[in-house]
Every structure is written in C-alpha cells, then in structure tokens.
A protein has these predicted regions:
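Conserved alpha/beta core of the MobA/IspD/sugar-nucleotide pyrophosphorylase nucleotidyltransferase superfamily
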Residues: 2, 163-208
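Nucleotide and nucleotide-moiety/phosphate-recognizing core
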Residues: 2-143, 177-188
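Short, flexible helix/strand-to-coil boundary loops that buttress conserved ligand/catalytic motifs
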Residues: 21, 62, 123, 158-161, ...
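Short aromatic/basic micro-patch
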Residues: 118, 148, 194-195
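Short, well-ordered alpha-helical scaffold segment located
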Residues: 118, 123, 153-156, 200
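A conserved catalytic-core signature of glycosyltransferases
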Residues: 142-144, 148-149, 168, 190
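Conserved nucleotide-sugar donor-binding
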Residues: 144-157, 198
Length: 208
C-alpha cells in the first residue's frame, strides 16, 4: 500500500472562529496535535503542517514546531514537518502549493483543511487503498475531505499562477477526466464538516 503524506492546511485567518483553529483546546490537547495524532495509525506516516496567518502563535504554542521547519519531528509516531506560507493572503491553494514544493515528487498526498476532522483508521484506509489521480470521500451524497492526490496530478498544481482564477484545488479537479477521479462512500459525516465557528466547534466537542 502506498502510504500518502498527510497535508494539514492551517494557513487561514480563522476570522469566524476568532482564534487559530489549530490551537483550539480539544480534550486537553491542541486541535492541530489531535489531527496529527489521528494519523499515527497509518504505518510510516508523514504529516506536513501548512501554516500562514498566525504562524507565530503556532510556533509559540508548540515550541517543537520551530524545529520541524528544518528537520522532521516525531510526534506520536508521525514524522511531522512544518511549512510556512509567507503569502497566505492568496488563500489555501497557495499554502498547498508551498507545502507541495517540500514533498517528495513521487509521493502521494492526502489534503485536509484544519477545520475538517480526520477520519478514523477504517475510513481513512478505504481512501488510501484506492488508486487514481484523485480520490474523494463522499457521505450523504456530499463530497468532502481528505482528498487523495497522486504525484502525477499534484505536480501539475505547482506551476499554476496564484493570481489565476484557476488557482483552486476543486477547479483543477473538475478539469480532470471523470475516469481519473474515484469517489469512496464513507459512513462518517466528518468528511463534509467545516468547523469554522465557535458554535460548530462547541457542538463538535460535545458530540464526539
């Protein structure tokens, strides 16, 4: 099984949340660390954390993130690498591009926004086991995350001008032949959750 690198996108402003989403408290730990820890069940796992706005708050809250910028850091069995997007104003796609430039060109990746909970091992494995240019989980007839991208596809994202209207992952996926996309049905509505407000966060913490 080709083990993909996890890319956690945490470079946004978190305006509606009011504070960096990855630094929210989740049962005594920080949310970004919880997300990383959920990937430990995948053997030989590597996680890239894409930071942008508020990156200094992340580095202050998690001191070893500073070390993980230059060298990978083992956290709960996951090799973590931190990448800072110095131009986060261009959106999450620019953060994704910044991270992808650090990833081995032959590696498969799975992309997850910080405000979408990572799936459990069984659901995640069902995504990882599928082989195509793009693999997308679905639940209740809604597409979601994490999205798996093979190296052939994601390498085509690197040259895209961040000023372009096409500088969006969903736009690039829509341009693919339908045979290049596999949809995997997941019995977990986490795939389409977007926990971007305090109300949604409080509800998630109470129900999970």
């Amino acid at each position: 099984m080709d083990i993909p690198n996890l890319i956690l996108l945490a470079g946004g402003k978190s305006t509606r949340m009011g504070s960096p989403k990855g630094l929210l408290d989740y049962r005594g730990t920080l949310w970004v660390l919880e997300q990383i820890a959920r990937y430990k069940f995948i053997e030989n796992s590597i996680a890239y954390i894409g930071l942008g706005y508020d990156y200094e708050q992340y580095l202050n809250a998690i001191p070893w993130f500073k070390d993980a910028i230059e060298n990978s850091y083992n956290y709960n069995g996951v090799e973590v690498r931190v990448v800072i997007n110095n131009q986060p104003q261009f959106g999450s796609f620019s953060t994704l591009q910044t991270v992808l430039k650090k990833v081995d060109i032959d590696s498969t990746v799975i992309v997850l926004p910080i405000d979408v909970p990572l799936l459990n091992k069984q659901s995640l494995t069902s995504i990882i086991n599928e082989n195509n240019k793009v693999v997308i989980p679905t639940c209740d007839a809604k597409n979601g995350h994490p999205v798996k991208l093979n190296s052939e596809f994601w390498n085509t994202l690197l040259p895209i001008d961040m000023f372009s209207k096409n500088a969006r992952l969903d736009t690039q996926i829509k341009q693919l032949n339908s045979l290049s996309i596999t949809f995997v049905n997941i019995i977990d509505n986490s795939v389409y959750q977007n926990i971007n407000t305090k109300e949604k966060w409080n509800y998630y913490c109470k129900t999970q």
